[in-house]
């Protein structure tokens, strides 16, 4: 059996830690899995290229203050990959309809890593939908002098080593590497990420389109990020008209997992300032 056949025949596994059952909203024939908890201002998170299917402590902290919504994009978590899905353009249009069906007019949008790229693309297309924008260790802009690491060239151990500063935190959130179903699922998610980011690993037009985004914007960098150079968060903050840069100490590329309290405080400060 090939990997592709295995992916198609393997049910989505449920992680032993932090798993919660999702809700589903069918959008243009694609059932979008999402988790939602809390009340108040609507805050939507676009996830990165991993750690799906979980309601992690950071999500719980956010839900204590806002209406926190965490969808899983096509090919990730429990959202299937439609045959027609190919680009960030497809994702942006899908999410716009998703928000429409949930009755969300204006939102606070948060994007992490690959999801930061997606959030930036969404903001550039639909700036009037946003009350605020927060980008956490985002990717998607071109850095000529320091392009960073190509994640598709790394082995899984090399990738996880670069994602985290704190290896105890890494071990807490990693799925069982010996679980066959988990291995197949992670392969399928990496393939979904490749559809969006294989080549090029940036959008030359994005930094120009971001000039349309006038809402309060927070860019969160990580002082010890060994996956994405700090120049990336610097550049996002520079090109966004109302961009503000905060860089968290003591964390690698995954501040959601390594510094959830500090990250929550920074995000809520930006959200409350725009509400």
Positions of the model-derived regions?
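Short beta-strand/loop motif that positions the catalytic acidic residue
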Residues: 213, 219-221, 225
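Conserved alpha/beta-hydrolase "nucleophile elbow" surrounding the catalytic nucleophile
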Residues: 107, 111-116, 222
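Short alpha-helix in the alpha/beta-hydrolase fold that links the catalytic acid
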Residues: 58, 215, 229-238
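Conserved HGGG/HGGXW glycine-rich cap/lid loop of the alpha/beta-hydrolase fold
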Residues: 28-78
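Active-site loop/oxyanion-hole signature of alpha/beta-hydrolase fold enzymes
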Residues: 27, 69-110, 265
């Amino acid at each position: 059996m090939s990997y592709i056949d295995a992916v198609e025949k393997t049910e989505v596994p449920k992680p032993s830690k932090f798993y919660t059952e999702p809700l589903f909203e069918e959008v243009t024939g694609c059932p979008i899995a999402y988790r939602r908890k809390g009340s108040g201002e609507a805050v939507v998170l676009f996830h990165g290229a991993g750690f799906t299917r979980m309601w992690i402590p950071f999500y719980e902290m956010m839900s204590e203050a806002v209406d926190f919504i965490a969808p899983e994009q096509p090919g990730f978590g429990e959202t299937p990959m439609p045959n027609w899905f190919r680009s960030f353009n497809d994702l942006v249009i899908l999410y716009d309809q998703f928000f429409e069906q949930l009755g969300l007019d204006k939102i606070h949008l948060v994007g992490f890593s690959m999801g930061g790229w997606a959030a930036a693309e969404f903001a550039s297309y639909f700036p009037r939908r946003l009350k605020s924008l927060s980008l956490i260790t985002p990717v998607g802009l071109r850095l000529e002098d320091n392009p960073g690491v190509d994640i598709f060239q790394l082995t899984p151990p090399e990738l996880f080593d670069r994602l985290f500063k704190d290896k105890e935190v890494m071990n807490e959130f990693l799925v069982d590497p010996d679980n066959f179903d988990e291995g197949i699922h992670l392969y399928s998610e990496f393939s979904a990420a490749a559809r969006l980011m294989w080549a090029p690993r940036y959008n030359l037009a994005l930094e120009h389109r971001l000039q349309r985004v006038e809402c309060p914007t927070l860019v969160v960098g990580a002082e010890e990020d060994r996956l994405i150079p700090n120049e990336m968060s610097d550049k996002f903050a520079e090109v966004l008209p109302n961009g503000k840069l905060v860089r968290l100490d003591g964390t690698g590329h995954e501040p959601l997992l390594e510094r959830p309290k500090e990250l929550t405080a920074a995000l809520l400060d930006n959200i409350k300032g725009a509400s």
